[in-house]
Swiss-Prot record:
Keywords: DNA-binding, Metal-binding, Nucleus, Transcription, Transcription regulation, Zinc. This is Terreic acid cluster-specific transcription factor atF. Residues 1-20 have a biased composition (Polar residues). Residues 55-64 have a biased composition (Basic residues). Transcription factor that regulates the expression of the gene cluster that mediates the biosynthesis of terreic acid, a quinone epoxide inhibitor of Bruton's tyrosine kinase. Residues 34-60 bind DNA. The lineage of its organism: Eukaryota, Fungi, Dikarya, Ascomycota, Pezizomycotina. GO terms for molecular function: DNA-binding transcription factor activity, RNA polymerase II-specific; RNA polymerase II cis-regulatory region sequence-specific DNA binding; zinc ion binding. One of its GO terms (biological process) is DNA-templated transcription.
Amino acid sequence: MFATFNSSMDNRSSANSPVAPSSRPKRTTVARACDWCRLNRVKCDDGQPCKNCRTRGVRCRKGSKSGEHNRPSSSAAASERARSQGAQMEPNQGNARAEEREKAATTSRRNSRTPSSSPSSPSPSQWRWPGAWIVDSVHTNSEPRYYGPSSFLHFTNRLRIYLDESLGQPQLGNALLSFTCSRVSSPSPNAMDDADLTEGTLTRQQEEYLLSLYWQSYHTIIPIVDADDFCAHYRSLWEPGQGATRRPSALVDIVLALCMQYSAALMASGDIELMDLESNDTNASGHWLYQRCQRLLLKDQDTLSLATLQTYIHSAVYLMNASCLNASHRVLSIAIHTATSLGLPHSPEGHPRGPQHALRQRIWWTLFFLDSKMSFELGQPYLMPEYHGTVDLSGSLELRIIENCRSVSTFGDITWLRYHDECLKLTSKVRHISNVAFEKSSEAMSRHSGTSIYENPSALEKGVSYLHKSMEALQAWSREVPTSLKLARKGNVSPFSTARCPLENDVYAPLWLQRQRVLLELLYHNLVMGLYRPYIRVADQSAVTSHAIGPTASHTSDSSSLCALNHAMATINIVYQVLTETDILNSWNRAFQYTWDATLTVLGFRLVHPGCPHSFSARRATAIANESFKIFSQYGYSGAAQAMTVTRELDRSIDLAVSREPG
C-alpha cells in the first residue's frame, strides 16, 4: 500500500552512504547554452537533454539561430513562458515560485536515477515513470498539482506540449489543459456564498419526493445504505404536528443534495438553447444542503458511526458529480480512514453474520471500488491495498436482505447487487494490470541512460506487450458477467466489444437494470482506454523534426494508440445512442466525463496519426462527441458547451495542419 514511500526512503538512505562526498562532480561549463536556458537566463550543462530541460519536460535544442526554425525566437520565448505559466492565469511572481517548487520536487525525485551516479545498471526502483506538475487553472493560488501517468490530465499536458512545440499553437494547448483542469477542480461548493445556507428550505413532501429518486438511482449504484434503517431514521427526525421542522441530519442532507443534483438535470428541458457558459450548472444543485451537511460533520467530527461514514462517501460522490475530483479524492481518504477506525475490514467478534455485517461489507467494498477508479483517473497512489480474493455481495444472505428493499427487485438470474460485484472484479483486475505494466516498462527503462520513456520504444513495448496478454483476463471477466447484466448489440456482436454496432435496447427491463448495463460497459471501455493511453507516443522525435504533424502511415502499427482509440470510439458511440434513444444518462455526470475523456483520446490520436487510415473514423467520432456535448448542454451541463468549443477548435487546427502537409 505504501510502496511509493519505501522507494523514496531507499533513495534517501543511499544518498546518505559514505560515498556521498564524491557523488557531486563539478559542473562542466559549456560554450553555448541550449535555447531554453538562454531564454530563461539560467545555467546550462553539457547533458543532452540538459538538466533544466529534463526537469521541465521540454525539448532541449542547442545552437539555433535566427531563421533556423519555423517560428521566430520571440514566438519560442513566448511559448516557453506560456508553458511555465500553466494556463496563463497565474501572476508572474506566483508562477516563478511554482516553477521553483516544481523544479526542486522533480530534481529530488530524479537524483536517484542519474546515469552518472553508478557505473552499473540501476535497479528497477531507481527509475519511476514521471508524472506531470500542472498549475490549477481554477484555484490560481494553489500549488502545482502532481498527476501520475495513468491520469487523463497527464495525457492532456502531453497534448498541450505537442500543440505548442509541433504545431506552434500554445494558446490552443493552454485552453485544452485549462478546460480539462476544470473537470477535476471546479469551484468547490464550500467556496459558495454562506448566505445560501439559509435560502434553501424544503417541505416534507418535497424531501420525500427527492428521496424516492434516490432508491431508483444511487441506491442501485452505490449500495451503502439500508433502506429500512434510513427511512426509520428519517421519520424520527420529524416532530409530530403540522408545520413541524426536521431536526438536523448530515446523512439526510447529503442524500437530498445528491437527489437535487440528479433531479435538476432530469427536469431540464431538452428543447432549450445551449446553456450559456456563465449559467449555473445543474451539477451544483443542492450545494446549500452539501454545505449544511459539512458543517454538521465538522460539529460531530469526533463521533464515529456508520452514518458518518455513509455521509462522507455520499459527499465524495456529490463532489465527483460537481467536477471536483481532487476534492472528492480527499474526502474519500477521510472516509477510508473512518471505515478503518470502525473496523470494517474485520469481522466483529461475537456478532452473527446478519444484515448489519452485510451492510458493512458493502460499504467497505464500495470504498475499494471508488478508490480504485478515482486514483486511477487522477494518477494518484491507491489508498487501499490490492485484493486478490473473491468478493460476492449478491449471495444468499443478500437475497434475504433484498426482499425488503424499496423500489428494487431481482431480474432474471441477477439481483441489483450483482452490478456492484462486477465493478469490484473489473476495477481490481485493471489496477493490478496497470501496476504490473508500469513496473515492466520501468524495469526496461532502468537499463537505459535515457530520461524520457517516450524516446525508448523498447521500454514502452514491454508494458504494451503485457497489456495485450492481460486482455485475456479481462475477456474472461466479460464472459462471466451474467447475460442479464450485459448490454446487447444488434447482430452477432458480443457485449463489451469495440465493434461499431448499434445497441439493442431492452425496454422491458427495469430502469435500474438498464442503467447498470450501460454504466458497466462504459466503465469497462473507460478503464481499458486508460490502460493503453499512457503508452501513446504523443511527441516523439520523428513528429518534431518532420514536416508532418505526426507519424505517417508507416507508424500506424502503434497498437497502443489503436486500442485506446477503439475503446474511446466505443464510449462515444454508446453514450450518443443512449442519449438520443433513452433518458437513462440524462442526469448522470459520469457519462459526460466519460465522453470528454474519450474525446481527448480521439483528438490525441488524430494529432499524432493524421495520415492513418483510422483517422477518418476518429474524425467522425469527434463529430458524434460534439452532438453528445450539445445534448448534455441542453440538459444543464454548462461544461458541455465549452467542450464543444475546444473540440471544434482542435478539429480545425488538425484539418488545417493536414491540408498543409506536402504530398
